[in-house]
């Protein structure tokens, strides 16, 4: 505070500079025009004009200037004196979405003229678009229903043209699209049926707007069974480290509102912050477990001592995780609920509730502070201490019953430009420890800065702490203090105020104050009706212009409830109803509103809660929820006169000017509002002349932008099966997950009545509506509920799917909510589709009393595939036999309840997939290809299914699947590169063909960034890379992989940041491995033997590295490249002179290396030699290894080509396409024939069989695609026809060339023809899937699988056993490449992860991975020495009559070398009874 003595004289100096020196200043004309600093095009904007102390008529004009010219916003506006006049204007659309322009305002009269020019930001107005799906999660085969809604920034509907909407699957495929459609009433509905075998995972609906913006909405596709009940876990949200106990409650509630009977198990854990799987549970968490029975209300309560969690220990998370499992009585169905409690060290906390943001010297500074405990509960009757050192203020006060204290600080003697108020309750704990958390009592502190006013006049808006509620009128108090000496004979002073919201001026007003020629002090109120136009944040500015030219003012920010003008209400009548009965849904909204209705089963919301449409989510769509400050380019330069830094001598006192950066002037208040001011009034404080370096603190920069948080469909119409006594028996078979999905229009009275039929599900239906009106805009209803319930019913418990022949237990539970006992008979209707045997020997009628239940079970073995219906009836019987002490009653209505539910039955055996690819180019004519789909003799009956995909781009499938190109695991440094490199080729290709969209670019760059980070995990300290990195004990870098990473990182620099050090280090490391003859030494172990077999090891590796260096690209004159080319040229010369020649693989690499180096002669020589060894068949060309292994016997279809052959053929293709200066027509003809063969080897994802072949082939295909791409307006027609009655047609053009169009083929086995006419090329991919029963055959691996124990004799064998594997290589080579052992789990079992992780301690195991039902084990290689591996599995869900599970071992790089074995659980026959 030592500067205070200097600051005071400086303020006096500033007053001398600004105060008028004679009365002639009185009445000087003042102009002020206020315009938002951000203007939106094609919408109404407002600017406000204030003219004061004028004695003549003036006109006001405004114009906007950009690089393309000037445009007048308004001209010759006549404004009255002392009246705040606001004028509306529109800004034309700009060619760029965001642009800085110059705004010029001119005020002109007979004797007065004022002109000022400043910058504003102009943004094109964009629509607000959201998507609503009927659910957030779907099963395969269900229909996705969704709506696209568009509004303006006032939430009024927009009937805009939407260029594109599409659905994208988890692999990135665009599986459906809708183009160029007009919204009606601001919305449009769509639907899309999912296939029976879709990819499971996260999908999204993408809306592409005309402006180029896009909106995405996610949904999930999974196989699931809806939960029957909710597990509600209640724990304290916060507990402090001092609490000794906590209360936990767990309740089970059915979706129809009744309590769940059953058993609960609760676990409360505090997890270790650095948990480990290797040292048991103690290294992971402190846990407390307990269990018990649910009471009659379905609840369980427990008081838990917190001592076990050691709340003050530091090494553990500051959270308690509570997990509760409820096991339903009878069915043994288990569902889980979770909650967490935050552990806080904060025992008490002080915070300012209301406090002035600035202080004005001489006006008391007000504040209100609240004291709460660690849970936020107010603490009354406690003494708190308040201090404001700059004002010499020290006080204490006692909190009231709400924990509040008010205070007021006299600011008369504050000498500085800031006032800091500190409030505390208790001092910090003196106890500190490295491992311990100490209690904390949080203080509150607030710094307020001085408001600059040379006139010593002020106006101040009272702060408000609460959110302003909709529909109310809020009163704001404005306090003022006026210095009589500045009024200069004025009789009435006008205070003007305006409100800004959503970035624009929305309201204005004036308050007149009669003044006297003396100092005045007082307050007045401003009334603000709270409506949607000022939500979600209102900024209020108040100001007055004094006769001296000084402007006094203040601004305040008020949070406003997210109001919507269209008030929507939704209600069911009745609110509870019987299944299949009639009900009414009543909607009220603004007249003529279009209302979108939705009602879903509460079970769906329990399965996956929705991101519900709400006022908050809609307001989050706004581009500007609040405008404050100026964007960086718009900060104005201060053109006013500055003060020199020389000392001033006045009346014997020397004054030293000091810069008061933090003082708040009127300009700062306007900047807080985001307003640009055109004025000749004094709104700025003086600033120092910039003679020396000075530092200024700028106000907030940038715009505050909010982001989105993220055909009428008929209602389901349930129908009762017609029986003679419809009230006696109910047959329930209609169980939709979405019940209502409708559009309705309310009438002129604002009401719509919708008649509905309640579905058969006994549950609670949750309904919602949003409505759009041209006048009132958007409205959203609160949730309405209808409970579908009947007091006596039967429900079925069964899994999502089962395997044919695998027995499962079907359970039927009869529930009686009648007040009396009933005697019930339960029957399962027989069917040829399954065999059912009662679990209980006797099927006698059961006695069920009030609120009771009875579960009846059958062991069911399905015999048919697909959806199999199960029909179960429960009937209340007339009987005189007592139930307990009473005679059973028979319900008057609904004495028999029948439920019909389907179950998906899947085929047994091992699934096989065969892919047939064709690239057909009609060139104005017609081309066709025959397709014969045959099935092997050992196919599982009814298991075959096939589909055809149609794409207009050769890379279409691959570019949508860059993260899923292989149907294999990605667990090492080389395999990671197949996630990385193809993105570069896709980006290059789309750039060159001008097809690159922002969406694809963004996605590909995202993959490049993550792949780059992941690849650095495999880097060594010396700059090299290896397959599993140093952390797996591979201490030597790998020459081949380092070259691969080097060239790919170098190529990725065009799209993402790559640290040059990684490139330099890898290049240096490689150059150190170059020998004197220019060839490279091999270093590190390669997992792929394809390039290290035979005498030409060194040449092949050297060719690969030379290619990598030239692709960086390094020039041929670079020393390392020059020497490497010498090595290759010498090797080629030797090969030509020798008898044995070169390996085909080596020649393919040499051809491409010479092509890259520009050595056309050598390229032609090698290609000529290769052409002599080419395999030519069916107008296609490829190359094979001379000693190609025999194809395994027993393949029904020719297997996919080996990885090495795809790779070498792709290198030849690259050599043809890299001719200098460009490929000739002969080169392209040869390339086309090669492409025909390569595309036939692609898998369903667009990749190939392994890593290198995928990377090189996609590189080659992208170059071929770019070389042959033509953008034509013509289209190709595709016809797929069977020899029977099936026929399907597609069209492929520029608009849908990247759309994956698909159709299922119904006739299997079958003969099909595929015909293409028109222009362009069409890529057709047929996928045939079927199951087979494994047969004994000769494999190149010996694979043995056993379980320990092998039999069911041991007591633990039901729930746990070991899997023991033995693997060796018996093929034609000395050892395999890297191999993967894939162990599928037996149904109902899961692996024990720590035992799987232990396998990595073996020298032969590089890595392990665990998925939901598979264990993957990576082996460096497999030789003829047997490897033994074992791990433990645990029972997760009981399943009877288990089918065997498959274990597969395969060579990662020669995928046609594999072996299959199967195993079963020791107790496979009777696990269902366990």
Curated annotation (Swiss-Prot):
Signal peptide interval: 1-23
Residue stretches spanning the membrane: none
Protein's UniProt name: Alpha-2-macroglobulin
Compartments in which it is found: Secreted
InterPro entries: A-macroglobulin_rcpt-bd, A-macroglobulin_rcpt-bd_sf, A2M/Complement_sys, A2M_N_BRD, A2M_TED, Alpha-macroglob_thiol-ester_cl, Alpha-macroglobulin_TED, Ig-like_fold
CDD domains (alphabetical): A2M_2
GO biological process entries: negative regulation of complement activation, lectin pathway; stem cell differentiation
UniProt keyword Secreted present: yes
Underlying gene: A2M
């Amino acid at each position: 505070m030592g500067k205070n003595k200097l600051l005071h004289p400086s303020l006096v100096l500033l007053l001398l500079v600004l105060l008028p020196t004679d009365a002639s200043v009185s009445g000087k004309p003042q102009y002020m025009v206020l315009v938002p600093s951000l203007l939106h095009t094609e919408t109404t904007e407002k600017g406000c004009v204030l003219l004061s102390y004028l004695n003549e008529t003036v006109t006001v004009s405004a114009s906007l200037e950009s690089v393309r010219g000037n445009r007048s916003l308004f001209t010759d506006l006549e404004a009255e004196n002392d009246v705040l006049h606001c004028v509306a204007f529109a800004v034309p659309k700009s060619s760029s979405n965001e642009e800085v322009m110059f705004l010029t305002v001119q005020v002109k009269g007979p004797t007065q003229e004022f002109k000022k020019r400043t910058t504003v930001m102009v943004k094109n107005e964009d629509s607000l678009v959201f998507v609503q799906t009927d659910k957030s999660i779907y099963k395969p085969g269900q229909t996705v229903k969704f709506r696209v809604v568009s509004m303006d920034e006032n939430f009024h509907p927009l009937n805009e043209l939407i260029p594109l909407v599409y659905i994208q699957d988890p692999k990135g495929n665009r599986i459906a699209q809708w183009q160029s459609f007009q919204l009606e009433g601001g919305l449009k509905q769509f639907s899309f049926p999912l296939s029976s075998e879709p990819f499971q995972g996260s999908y999204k609906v993408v809306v592409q707007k005309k402006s180029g913006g896009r909106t995405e909405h996610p949904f999930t596709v999974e196989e699931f069974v809806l939960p029957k009940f909710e597990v509600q876990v209640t724990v304290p949200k916060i507990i402090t480290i001092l609490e000794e106990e906590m209360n936990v409650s767990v309740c089970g509630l059915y979706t129809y509102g009744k309590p769940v009977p059953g058993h609960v198990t609760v676990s409360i854990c505090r997890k270790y912050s650095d948990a480990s799987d290797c040292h048991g549970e103690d290294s992971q968490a402190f846990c407390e477990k307990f269990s018990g029975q649910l009471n009659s209300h379905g609840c369980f309560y427990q008081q838990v001592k917190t001592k076990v969690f050691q709340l003050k220990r530091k090494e553990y998370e500051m959270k308690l995780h509570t997990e509760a499992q409820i096991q339903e009585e009878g069915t043994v169905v288990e569902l889980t609920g979770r909650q967490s409690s935050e552990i806080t060290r904060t025992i008490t906390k002080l915070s300012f509730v209301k406090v002035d943001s600035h202080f004005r010297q001489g006006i008391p500074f007000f504040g209100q502070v609240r004291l709460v405990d660690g849970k936020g509960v107010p603490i009354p009757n406690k003494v708190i201490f308040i201090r404001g050192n700059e004002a010499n203020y020290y006080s204490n006060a006692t909190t009231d019953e709400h924990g509040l204290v008010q205070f007021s600080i006299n600011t008369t003697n504050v000498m500085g430009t800031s006032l800091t108020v500190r409030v505390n309750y208790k001092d910090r704990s003196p106890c500190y420890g490295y491992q311990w958390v100490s209690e904390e009592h949080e203080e509150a502190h607030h710094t307020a800065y001085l408001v600059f006013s040379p006139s010593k006049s002020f106006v101040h808006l009272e702060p408000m702490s609460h959110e302003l509620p909709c529909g109310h009128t809020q009163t704001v108090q404005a306090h003022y203090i006026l210095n009589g000496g500045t009024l200069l004979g004025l009789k009435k002073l006008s205070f003007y105020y305006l409100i800004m919201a959503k970035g624009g001026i929305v309201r204005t007003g004036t308050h007149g104050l009669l003044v006297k020629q003396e100092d005045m002090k007082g307050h007045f109120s401003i009334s603000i009706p709270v409506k949607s136009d000022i939500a979600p944040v209102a900024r209020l500015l108040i100001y007055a212009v004094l006769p001296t030219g000084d402007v006094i003012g203040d601004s305040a920010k008020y949070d406003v409830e997210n109001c919507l003008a269209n008030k929507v209400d939704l209600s069911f009548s009745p609110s509870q109803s019987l299944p299949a009965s009639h009900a009414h849904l009543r909607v009220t909204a603004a007249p003529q509103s279009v209302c979108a209705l939705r009602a879903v089963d509460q079970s769906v919301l329990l399965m996956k809660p929705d991101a519900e449409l709400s006022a908050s989510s809609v307001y989050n769509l706004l581009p500007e929820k609040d405008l404050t400050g100026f964007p960086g380019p718009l900060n104005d330069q201060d053109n006013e006169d500055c003060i020199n830094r020389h000392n001033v001598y006045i009346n014997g006192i020397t004054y030293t000017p000091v810069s008061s950066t933090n003082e708040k002037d009127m300009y700062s208040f306007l900047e807080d509002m985001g307003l640009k001011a055109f004025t000749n009034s004094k709104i700025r404080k003086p600033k120092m002349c910039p003679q020396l370096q000075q530092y200024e603190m700028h106000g907030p920069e940038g715009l505050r932008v909010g982001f989105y948080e993220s055909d009428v469909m008929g209602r389901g119409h349930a129908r009762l099966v017609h029986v003679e006594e419809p009230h006696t028996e109910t047959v329930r078979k209609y169980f939709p997950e979405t019940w209502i999905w409708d559009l309705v229009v309310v009438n002129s009275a604002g009401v719509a009545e919708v008649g509905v039929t309640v579905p058969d599900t006994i549950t609670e239906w949750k309904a919602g509506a949003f409505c759009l009106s041209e006048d009132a805009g958007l409205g959203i209803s609160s949730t309405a509920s209808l409970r579908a319930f009947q007091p006596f019913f039967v429900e079925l418990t069964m899994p999502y799917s089962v395997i044919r022949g695998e027995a499962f237990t079907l359970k039927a539970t009869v529930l009686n909510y009648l007040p009396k006992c009933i005697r019930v008979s339960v029957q399962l209707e027989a069917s040829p589709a399954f065999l059912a045997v009662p679990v209980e020997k006797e099927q006698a009628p059961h006695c069920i009393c009030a609120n009771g239940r009875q579960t009846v079970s059958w062991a069911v073995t399905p015999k048919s595939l697909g959806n199999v219906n199960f029909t179960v009836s429960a009937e209340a019987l007339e009987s005189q036999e007592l139930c307990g002490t009473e005679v059973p009653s028979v319900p008057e209505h609904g004495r028999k309840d029948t439920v019909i539910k389907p179950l998906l039955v899947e085929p047994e055996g091992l699934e096989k997939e065969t892919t047939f690819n064709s690239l057909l180019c009609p060139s104005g004519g017609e081309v066709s290809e025959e397709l014969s789909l045959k099935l092997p003799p050992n196919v599982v009956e009814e298991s075959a299914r096939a589909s055809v995909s149609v794409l207009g781009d050769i890379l279409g499938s691959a570019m949508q699947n860059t993260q899923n190109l292989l149907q294999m695991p990605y667990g090492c440094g080389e395999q990671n590169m197949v996630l990385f490199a193809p993105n570069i080729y896709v980006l290059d290709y789309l750039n060159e063909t001008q097809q690159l969209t922002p969406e694809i670019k963004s996605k590909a760059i995202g993959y490049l960034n993550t792949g780059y980070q992941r690849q650095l995990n495999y880097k060594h300290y010396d700059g090299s890379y290896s397959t599993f990195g140093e952390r797996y004990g591979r201490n030597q870098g790998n020459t081949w992989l380092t070259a691969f990473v080097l060239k790919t990182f170098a190529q990725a620099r065009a799209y993402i940041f790559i640290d040059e050090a990684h490139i330099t280090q890898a290049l240096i490391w490689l150059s150190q491995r170059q020998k004197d003859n220019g060839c490279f030494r091999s270093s590190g172990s390669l997992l792929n033997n394809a390039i290290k077999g035979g005498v030409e090891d060194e040449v092949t590796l050297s060719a690969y590295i030379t290619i990598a260096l030239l692709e960086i690209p390094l020039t041929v004159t670079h020393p390392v490249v020059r020497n490497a080319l010498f090595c290759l040229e010498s090797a080629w010369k030797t090969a030509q002179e020798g008898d044995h020649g070169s390996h085909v693989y080596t020649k393919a690499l040499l051809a491409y290396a010479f092509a890259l180096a520009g050595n056309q002669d050598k390229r032609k020589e090698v290609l000529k030699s290769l052409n002599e060894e080419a395999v030519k068949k069916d107008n296609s060309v490829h190359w094979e290894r001379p000693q190609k292994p025999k194809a395994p016997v027993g393949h029904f279809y020719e297997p996919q080509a080996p990885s090495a052959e795809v790779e070498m053929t792709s290198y030849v293709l690259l050599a043809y396409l890299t001719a200098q200066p460009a490929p000739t027509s002969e080169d392209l003809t040869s390339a086309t024939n090669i492409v025909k063969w390569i595309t036939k080897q692609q898998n369903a994802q667009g990749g190939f069989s392994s890593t290198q072949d995928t990377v090189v082939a996609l590189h080659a295909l992208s170059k071929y695609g770019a070389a042959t791409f033509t953008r034509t307006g013509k289209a190709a027609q595709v016809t797929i026809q069977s020899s029977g009655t099936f026929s399907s047609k597609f069209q492929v053009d520029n608009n849908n060339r990247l759309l994956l169009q698909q159709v299922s083929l119904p006739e299997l086995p079958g003969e099909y023809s595929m015909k293409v006419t028109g222009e362009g090329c069409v890529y057709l991919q047929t996928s045939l899937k079927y199951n087979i029963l494994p047969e004994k055959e000769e494999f190149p691996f010996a694979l043995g699988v056993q379980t320990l124990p092998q039999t069911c004799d041991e007591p633990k064998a039901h729930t746990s056993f070991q899997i023991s594997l033995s693997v060796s290589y018996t093929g034609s080579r000395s050892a395999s490449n890297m191999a993967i052992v894939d162990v599928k789990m037996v149904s109902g079992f899961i692996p024990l992860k720590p035992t799987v992780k232990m396998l990595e301690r073996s020298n032969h195991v590089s890595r392990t991975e665990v998925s939901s039902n598979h264990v993957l084990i990576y082996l460096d290689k497999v030789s003829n020495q047997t490897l033994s591996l074992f791990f433990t599995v645990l029972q997760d869900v009981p399943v009877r009559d288990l089918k065997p599970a498959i274990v597969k071992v395969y060579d990662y790089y020669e995928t046609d070398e594999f072996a299959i074995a199967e195993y079963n659980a020791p107790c496979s026959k009777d696990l269902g009874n366990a």
